[in-house]
Amino acid sequence: MLSLVQKIIGSRNERFIKKVSRIVQKINSLEPEFEKLSDEQLKAKTFEYRERLANGEILDNLLPEAFATVREAGKRTKNMRHYDVQLIGGIVLHQGKVAEMRTGEGKTLVATLPAYLNALTGDGVHVITVNDYLAKRDAELMSDIYEFLGMSVGVIVADLNPQQRKEAYACDITYGTNNEFGFDYLRDNMAYEKEQQVQRSRNYVIIDEVDSILIDEARTPLIISGASDDSSEMYNLFNRLVPYLEKQEKEEVENEQEQRDFYVDEKSKNAYLTEKGYAKIENMLKKEGILEEDDNLYSPHNITKMHYLNACLRAHSLYQLNIDYIVRDQEIVIIDESTGRAMPGRRWSDGLHQAIEAKEGVKINAENQTMASITFQNFFKLYNKIAGMTGTADTEAFELHSIYGLEVIIIPTNKPMIRKDHHDEIYGSVREKFDAIVEDIKERISKGQPVLVGTASIEASEVLSTLLKKKKIRHNVLNAKQHEKEASIIAMAGYPGNVTIATNMAGRGTDIILGGNLEVEIAQLEDPTPEDIAQIKAEWLKRNEAVKKAGGLCIIGSERHDSRRIDNQLRGRAARQGDPGESKFYLSMDDNLLRIFASQSMAERVKKGLKGGESLAFGFMSKVISKAQGKVESYHFDIRKNLLEYDNVVNTQRKVIYEQRQSFLEAEDVSDILADIRIDVAEQLFHDYVPAGSMHELWDLEGLEKALKSDFMIELDLQKLYQEDDSLGEEDLKKLVREAIEIEFVEKTKNLDSGAVRQFEKFSLLQSLDTHWREHLSSIDHLRNSINLRGYAQKDPKNEYKKEAFELFSTMLDNFKYEVISSLAKIRIATEEETQRAQQEWQESMSDIKAEHESVIDNNQRHDEDEQEETPKVQQVRREGPKVKRNDPCPCGSGKKYKQCHGKVE
């Protein structure tokens, strides 16, 4: 029924394309008029549009003329004319949607249309790419168009200093990576002077490879952190002990003889000790002198030991060299599971990275304390309008819409796509599969057809490379180990008979041109003459035609990825802009996707039915594979959705803190803010000792006097005052306390330079807020890590998390207010020079902070899905009863007052 309706009225996508085609016709009708304009007249259009906006006209009304202006500027500066389908893509992006455009359809040029239009407002436009190379390349390629029209262009890359960043953000259009934009946002919210902040408003963002950034990267938060205590000895110890543990093949075993020390869950990348394993590791720790004879790992004080043990167990049993990571320059470098790229600077959390460092025998870096963090999901939601481009978004359309409110529109290709997609071939073993791939490659290159082989891991690419070398087949390898050669390898990938092996081609960002990249060849010539260029072009045309006759670029996939989208990205490298091309995937029943997610009975039947070297290639198996991929995609979507629900709690708190902090930073004078805080603190302190509406017998005036003296340097004999006048009520005493705190501050500052006082007050506010926020993030991390254990008490972990996170936040705000007023009361107010020196010292003390796109994919999976984890990673003392007063004994049992123990601010 649905298909019948769609045939009659067309799909939603078709109706949208038909609707915007009318706008395209309007733009096309303006082309002859704009062609007649002189350069000066065309440039003047920018000023005209800005004036019209200032007079109340809206961007939608300006769109046809603005797009016609950019198209004409492209023709004059780059000899590039925007196709009609590119105009459609530009309209989609302006409307805050995702444009799915096939590889080679010119997404970089498309972005100039909405970027120019939205930059007319003066609020800036951000264009996000997946790496620094693409950010620089795209900005340089398109800067001629923008600058011709009077628009400034900036680029944010990793090695810029703060002043250069500020200048780049001040430009009309700023290119950069998602990491750099996100980290600059976090750093701006750690600045101590307004002038140190580099970003301005987050108005409109265009995200290239939007599916990669908003979906693949969604589970990996940006984290700014500082080093915590060194624990390398413990990691080295457990790294030495874990190899003695034996792996159990499955979770449940039929008899005790089959029981081993641990088992793994490959779906969630977790490893679990059995009871036998616990006993074995306990005995080893006792022999090492780490555990006492009567001690056990279940004791609360051994929680940290379990942390090291679990991290090392996972490092040894689940993470493999050259698949999950590589060792480069004596450092562990994570490999992105989606793109195959090495990601220097990114670290796994929860001690996993340190465990792998111990495993590989490199220096163990200290675990880090989070100082600021945000997920891409919540960072990009800060923009007024989001748009995205990609070659493969349709399979993720539901997630993009449900989480980000982004509609996916499939843009028609400029020329018909004529790629031939062959059925998958499935073999019984990995070796048989690789042998078949080598034979296929040999046959194709014999007729001059270039081949791109996509692999899922470095290990697979190196195995295949070894087999090709044995057959004396020349080839290039592109993986995380050869990333420096990427551009030159891709430039040659379309040569007749060339073979290129690439680990996960997703996000490579460079088109493979049949016959080779002509522009690269010309650029490599030194002072070429017109004759040299003409000869190069003629040779390229011959090669281009030869490759087309051979069938175009052939894509061979060595296995299916977990995500159909990644497979489609690999396929999409062939048959660009109407060129011929082919694609084919080779699989084995030992591939991870089929081994983990296909049923065991299915795998056994297929293996039995295949004799040595035989393969299956029919539609039924394609359905099995598609179903397995659907399971994985659904599984990962649930993880991302779950993570977002948890992170939204912290995100709400982050917004409150950052807005409050920004108001402190922008205020010339924070004395009114402090006056309000002093009132809150006086109220808080008073009711800690005099419960609201209570009888006199419950008042602790002596405790209140001691707190005033120790925390605020105030001598106030409340007991004497009450004895002299027992008509004094609760409100009267509260007023006395409030006035005493206010008078003390006025007396302390009345003879000091007001400028120095104001500067010191602002510094104290910012420093105290940062300290408390950092400690709060640590508490939230601990809460998040252990909250799933609430399931044992028949409580919903998510609701418990929201409730307790709110309580922690409220307590943090109370403590912040109390400590900042207490500190100002006890500290001598510094001179302006001393304050500046203190600010400098504080910032120098934070100079070791690291900006990391911390890979918590697998660790968050563990927290989100494993409701049955037996041992919490941390133990946190948490209030179950009435609020603990600052002078009460700390609930942890240390014997100290709460304010000097867990209520203390370092």
From Swiss-Prot:
Residues bound to Zn(2+): 890, 892, 901-902
Cofactor note as given: May bind 1 zinc ion per subunit.
Membrane topology listed for this record: Peripheral membrane protein
Molecular function in Gene Ontology: ATP binding; metal ion binding; protein-exporting ATPase activity
Superkingdom, natural source: Bacteria
UniProt EC number: 7.4.2.8
GO CC aspect terms: cell envelope Sec protein transport complex; cytosol; plasma membrane
Primary localization class, coarse: membrane
Compartment annotation: Cell inner membrane; Cytoplasm
Top EC class of this enzyme: translocase
GO biological process, one term: protein targeting
Family, as annotated: Belongs to the SecA family.
Name by which UniProt lists this protein: Protein translocase subunit SecA
